[in-house]
Amino acid sequence: MRGPVCAITYRLRRAVRRRSSRTLNTWKEQNTLEWRKMRRFRQQISQEECLEVLRNEKRGVLALNGENGYPYALPVNFFYDEEDGRIYFHGAKEGAKMDCLQADDRVCFLVYTQGFQKEGDWAYYPTSVIVRGRVSILSDPARIKEQCRKIGLKYYPTEGSVEKVLRDTEGRFSVLALSVEHMTGKLVHES
């Protein structure tokens, strides 16, 4: 007996095989550089509310186009820089994340809040933000240090502790900049 996931996968593959290449190509032509509209549009939040989530939350999930066609998603610390409108991450200079980005710079980044609970209601109301865009790897040492300082100030208790970490780790990590191409957010109702 097949499990529910296997049955769904089987049906999806069969549906894709049935779809003619002409229909698929027409769909691609119509949707080039256009983003799908949110189905639950009444729950959509404003761009300013999306930015507020990016400013306040400490962690998100960065999804990359991974090896062998499998998505690769990982939790990351981040900093939204209001001066240039980019989202910055830091990490090792080598590894799976960097290999994926070398092959394809398109990413999806998800951040969500813990949410709130209305009095007398069992459900939570988290807010989620999804950002799509392209990531570049910074190469200018001064810019790398500047963005690392900004990231550090979001997470470390004092500026002195940030400066110490920067001195101790200088040149041992990379900084990634996500240029936002599309951003949406919504207030999720779990019921």
Predicted regions: what they are:
Residues 34-41, 116-191:
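Charged, gly/pro-rich active-site loop segments
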Residues 2, 11-22:
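Basic polycationic patches enriched in arginine
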Residues 27-56:
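Extreme N-terminal tail/first-helix region
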Residues 91-96, 152:
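Short, solvent-exposed aromatic-acidic interface loops
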Residues 44-45, 56-61, 158-161:
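Short Pro/Gly-enriched beta-strand edge/turn motifs at strand-loop
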